[in-house]
Amino acid sequence: MAGDKKFVEDITPMDEDFAQWYTDIVKKAELADYSSIRGCMIIRPNGYAIWENIQKYVDTKLKEYGHENVSMPIFIPENLLQKEKDHVEGFAPEVAWVTHGGDDELAERLCVRPTSETLFCEHYAKIVQSYKDLPKLYNQWCSVVRWEKTTRPFLRTTEFLWQEGHTIHETKEEAESHSLKILNMYSRLCEDMLAMPVVMGKKTDKEKFAGADDTYTIESLMHDGKALQAGTSHYLGQNFSKAFAIQFSDRNGKLDYPHYTTWAVTTRLIGAIIMVHGDNSGLKLPPRIAPTQAVIIPVAQHKEGVLEKAKELKEKLAKVVRVKLDDSDKMPGWKYSEYEMKGIPLRIEIGPKDIEKNQAVLVRRDNREKTIVSLDEIEIKVQEMLDIIHNSMLEEAKKTRDEKTYVATNMEEFEDTIENKPGFIKAMWCGDRACEDKIREVTGATSRCMPFEQEVVSDTCVCCGKKAKNLVYWGRAY
């Protein structure tokens, strides 16, 4: 029938056009659709359910750490945004402004929040007086607006969803420790939930957050060899506290400024899932983040007892996994392709012969392997299989990343690698901003991070040949 056309036929092969392959999956897997507003997207139920699972993980961890959720206004008065000079200069090109309320021109322009440091600082200045009031550990789930010039669903949009944490602490040591604690949590989110390996490290001064003392990052590598910043955690020092006059009486009765951290992950993680795990058949969802972990497909469901057994199986499995039964009248072959394209980690087939033998067939999305299991053990076997799939996807992603991580010791090697073998490039750097700028100008690669796990691949800077200070991961990035 015409309605049974296989969607996978419409997915552009990634080797042919990676950008189109990505867009095809976003649309065909019904993750998002384009809005009539430039750069904005409609996140559809399949996409939003992934975000909800990310939210559950992060929100649970934050509450374990003592954070509280709040909600700040969407608008920021212009005078408030101007208070931290480096911060406003960093965001000025991306700010959207509200100038009118109805037909009346506003006395002061309102910025649609690109991030909320200024709002949190204004509030903290009102409620913090003593060291006994610290730390303040606040987080909010919201959308922000940044007027991007080049957009792509999930990866870079004018409006996007995120969580933004804002905390203030009594000491520098406590704040820095907290910033790294959050980064570690983000790393576990990526590896334990998204099956996505990351490199943890510190940004260079050029790449750090506007107004920060230090920015820490997790960087992931996509199928096409481009890097993606998957999450950041910033130590802002006392810069914002001083700009907004947030003061507290310390343990000696003297006035001091608290130390600030801020950190975020966004819906771009959904784009990362697509580009790390997807293939030419479509989306490939890691089981722990997948809204539907298993789909039951009855074979020859018109035959007596098949549909009843499938429903019984769903009821049994629903107690231990997120499961769906497709009892529509579409052909099994169409369903196989449909759910493969939508990335459901595990397919469970059951037909008359399976029922006779008290068994079902499990088919993995990640490698299409089939396993026959007894219906008496199916709850345990399905859970075990989902863990196996997660571990396999993580190992495969690590293998791909490692195969696409190269070493360069001079600019000739660097340029040749970036043009012919896209991926991470490990190269030494002298610490001079001029060399960092030159590398970007010549190759289009940016410094992704100075990894916490430092190694020496050369004694000299890849760009100027002077004595090296740090190993840096470089790459072209989203």
Swiss-Prot record:
- Name the Pfam families on file: HGTP_anticodon (PF03129), ProRS-C_1 (PF09180), tRNA-synt_2b (PF00587)
Which SUPFAM superfamilies does this entry report, sorted A to Z?
A: C-terminal domain of ProRS, Class II aaRS ABD-related, Class II aaRS and biotin synthetases
Q: Does the keyword tRNA processing apply?
A: no
Could you tell me which InterPro entries the record lists for this protein?
A: aa-tRNA-synt_IIb, aa-tRNA-synth_II, aa-tRNA-synth_II/BPL/LPL, Anticodon-bd, Anticodon-bd_dom_sf, Pro-tRNA-ligase_IIa, Pro-tRNA-ligase_IIa_arc-type, Pro-tRNA_ligase_II_C
Give the UniProt entry's GO cellular component terms.
Answer: aminoacyl-tRNA synthetase multienzyme complex; cytoplasm
Q: What is its main location?
A: cytoplasm
The keyword ATP-binding belongs to this UniProt entry's keyword annotation? yes
The domain of life for this entry's organism is: Bacteria
Molecular function as annotated in GO:
ATP binding; catalytic activity, acting on a protein; proline-tRNA ligase activity; transferase activity
Which biological process annotations from GO are given for this protein? prolyl-tRNA aminoacylation
Gene3D superfamilies, A to Z: Anticodon-binding domain, Bira Bifunctional Protein, Domain 2, C-terminal domain of ProRS
Indicate the enzyme's highest-level EC class.
ligase
Which compartments does it reside in?
Answer: Cytoplasm
Q: Look up the EC number in the record and give it.
A: 6.1.1.15
Q: Which PANTHER family match?
A: BIFUNCTIONAL GLUTAMATE_PROLINE--TRNA LIGASE (PTHR43382:SF2), PROLYL-TRNA SYNTHETASE (PTHR43382)
What's this chain's function? Catalyzes the attachment of proline to tRNA(Pro) in a two-step reaction: proline is first activated by ATP to form Pro-AMP and then transferred to the acceptor end of tRNA(Pro).
Quaternary structure note = Homodimer.
So what family is this one in? Answer: Belongs to the class-II aminoacyl-tRNA synthetase family. ProS type 3 subfamily.
Instruction: Please report the name of this protein according to its UniProt entry.
Output: Proline--tRNA ligase
User: To which species is this protein native?
Assistant: Clostridium botulinum (strain Kyoto / Type A2)
Taxonomic lineage: Bacteria, Bacillati, Bacillota, Clostridia, Eubacteriales
